[in-house]
């Protein structure tokens, strides 16, 4: 159990310092195996961008090949956004066993089954929380279907290999959605939020809470009410809550809600106790719910929501078209985990959250904290945390602070569209906050984006060297980049991902690492020789 107090400490947290120091010993051994002599271990960070299932699968391929080539053992930090967080977290739940991880991936995508009943149980349970939001629904009903897994472990379970230094230190990115206006206007550093096996918090403020108490209620820096640590399924939903734009996400959610009332009898029996004649028992309450939401429409609009009740009308119409036999499935499982009232409460809460478009609601651990001068941060009772890809689709802002002393960044970009948009956005962010980052002329980025190669090496006068690896590139894809992009579109549902679709993407991601191994080793060797923060002789260049 972590500390029950809020920590306001500039720089690295104590647990991270200890873990990183232990990791240095393993990195030095790994460098020696790679024939790189170093008195001090350079800090290498690997970044994985967002990109839904495409990023999930490609990031697994990158990690697997880096392990195979002996490169992963020389890495200090692993950081991810959105779909890459699903891959990175899987590395730790499998204790770093890449063979087991790939076997699990093949198993998951060799079958079409998805345990809807279990996912629905988890969602109904989550709806009992006062802070239930669309993130809960998204995590258990959408992301679990996309990835075909529902992990129940926790971030704190990852501590052992991290503290022993046997695996890199993981950082999972999110942003504070309430600060989006500040981000749009000034790229406010406070927007970024991070999760590690030890803590969750705002690195720009040095404000953290133990990961075991993330979601618990705090006031004036003291624990007021303890809530259970959120499981990895929920966090994956939070980190990956922007697979598409608002319209795409809305359609995902409404489609799932529409389908709930046409569930098979066995699903009802596994999720709702005393499910006999459930149709007759829930139709009237759902009808009242629809009428209630219509009455509340002006209130919800005042709160900035965009009410849309068509899905609920369709739910009711679907139900009336369902045969009586299906509506009145008998209850054969008295051990079911929910009740009809639980189900109705879940639908009611989801309806309200959908109307208000409320995501990522959690208690603000900085509420009324006297050590925070910014009242915007301490006056709110709740935070609303969402996918960091809505700001920058890769976690550069979390590894660039000088306290982490990163010397070399391997940026694997699995984004849709322009693979240099993350470089542009990070350049703008760093310019505004005077953070060292290689500058690249816009004309050069435009040229590169038309026919991207597999690796770009960016160097500035100070700060880390950045190696940027576009997933779809001319070296691997030739003239077929557009075809590859269409095949692995971010918005494609998991149903379209068969093993025949997964294997080529996994192989492509591995090849990008393998074909650039010499360049990676060269930059690792340079980092070991030119220990940060010594100046690099070259200006930004392509190697």
Question: For each of these PLM feature ranges, what is it?
Answer:
Residues 95-111, 342-345, 420-463, 471:
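Acidic, Ser/Thr-rich peripheral helices and adjacent loops at domain boundaries
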Residues 57-59, 87-92, 183, 394-397, ...:
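A short acidic (Asp/Glu
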Residues 49-51, 74-91, 172:
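Catalytic nucleophile loop
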Residues 1-44, 48, 93, 100:
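N-terminal charged/capping segments associated with class I S-adenosyl-L-methionine
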Residues 405-429:
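A short, conserved beta-to-alpha structural element at the edge of catalytic cores
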Residues 45, 76, 169, 406-407:
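Conserved acidic residues
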Residues 24-78, 109:
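Helix-rich "cap/lid" substructures immediately adjacent to catalytic or cofactor-binding pockets
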Residues 71, 93-95, 101-405, 450, ...:
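Patatin-like phospholipase A catalytic core
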